Amino acid sequence: MKQEEEKLTGLPENAFRALKPGEVYNPLMSPDKKYPEVNLWSVLWGIAMAILFSAAAAYLGLKVGQVFEAAIPIAIIAVGVSGAAKRKNALGENVIIQSIGASSGVIVAGAIFTLPALYILQESYPEEITVTFTQVFISSLLGGVLGILFLIPFRKYFVSDMHGQYPFPEATATTQVLVSGEKGGSQAKPLLLAGIIGGLYDFIVATFGWWNENFTTRVCGFGEMLAEKAKLVFKVNTGAAVLGLGYIVGLKYASIICAGSLAVWWIIIPGMSLIWGDSVLNQWNPEITATVGAMAPEEIFKYYAKSIGIGGSAMAGIIGIIKSWSIIKSAVGLAAKEMGGKADAKANVKRTQRDLSMKIIAIGSIITLVLVTLFFYFDVMQGNLLHTLVAILLVAGISFLFTTVAANAIAIVGTNPVSGMTLMTLILASVVMVAVGLKGPGGMVAALVMGGVVCTALSMAGGFITDLKIGYWLGSTPVKQEAWKFLGTIVSAATVGGVMIILNKTYGFTSGQLAAPQANAMAAVIEPLMNGVGAPWLLYGIGAVLAIVLNFCKIPALAFALGMFIPLELNVPLVVGGAVNWYVTSRSKDAALNAERGEKGTLLASGFIAGGALMGVVSAAMRFGGVNLVNDAWLNNTWSEVLALGAYAILIFYLVKASMKTK
């Protein structure tokens, strides 16, 4: 036993580098032995994590349009509880807890990027559109199941064949947390403390409104004049959760996102006002009656500039598919070979290489697609067979093709570009469904539910490759991770549906209190297409050309385009958090000390995210119950913004100082 415990103290030295010819990677848990993995302990804790983090991620995602990855905080909690319970050989159990629990973030990302658009459009069409829990739950559930089934044939390629070729940033961080199980106590303390600080901070803002959530340059007369005359404005969200998110995203990626945002807010919006100030540009939206010069910067963003970002995101998704074509071909070839192989070949496969069989995947995929077809036919398409068949072909084709794009993005940057790919799906679905005769509010619902299924499938595919890579490094049994991922999907889909209903009834997606930027973008794309007004193809085209140019210049087009349609105040804090990350990891000449400080900061940032998001859900539940303690008159006072800036500075100071203190 002692010998085995010594063996489990660190990853092999070849875990992160490419293997030499003939070299084999041997994971921590030996492929020739059996370890505790799936049992009552791991399953119950996995379910608890899925519920907890689904609620938190749904709130934060709808609030700021960014979903934090739950894998790291869940891994920390799993290590902490197994250590507290003094469980022996808990590594395999912790992987299962993490795998079931991490369904939360991916299901949330899939659901909240599309389905709130149903509520947004319901405001405009209250009689024609009704949104039910069943629609949200079933589209999230079936999309998640499709994502799991479509990804499994690609597992071997991404986690084993390409060993050392992809950085897998999030999987690396999560694996290190799980490996350092003996650090459970010391890691849990800063996470818990930061969770309390971040939670209280965001709770005070959301529940009591002691200071403003955003700081803007409109706080002074000169800033007000700049916004009105030159259409120049600067904004920053001062929340703890978004600051933590920026730290984990890192300075490089956050800077690219923010660059996209600044290009829109400081170049395109003022430029449009300068060039077309006296014009009424309403070719794509007859409801626009004001001249561009008479609009506030926020209105120019909403009606025009955001569409350029939408076009850029869609093109970035297409570029991703083109780059992944060889991966798709090789995985399909491997799957076909196994389908034609002999049954007894399975017995010789090592424990750490066992997947669900291709026959189960094929049958499961067919059953899931049949269920999606029935859901579309009876609920979404109102019994129209042609519309249903066209919809299922689109959903199945796009979900499968984009699976590799999602997995590839996660493997390289740890960020799933699912919203851009879903936007392309919605544009394509809307154009095709209009061509086969489905228009108006019914067409909007159909396109959004189709988008919801695709978005959740792609989000799941991207997130699940992280879990499988963690399992590969540690020596888990893939088939167990794959089988129990379905349970996490069911629990997360149900939780997200409930949270979305509560948030809509409490705040409403059109109130401005929930940014839901992706869902608003989806609604903005679909409505003109389905009403025969036509879409702003010129603006989409400008965005698409920009994405091609960015890709040519080796700049991540998707990150830049995302920044273009996510509000400025939510992108600036990402850079602030990223800058804190850079600062704490570059102060010393000792690389090991810098790495240690970076890990400490990741723990604190995870605490900010989890605490801030969870207390955001509590605050929303209080509002839902009729408790509203916010003084709106104070929040409209400029001093509430000044106070917000002061509180934000203290929070940043704490994050820097606490991250630098590693002993």
Regions found by a protein language model. Name each.
Residues 1-663:
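Alpha-helical multipass membrane-protein architecture
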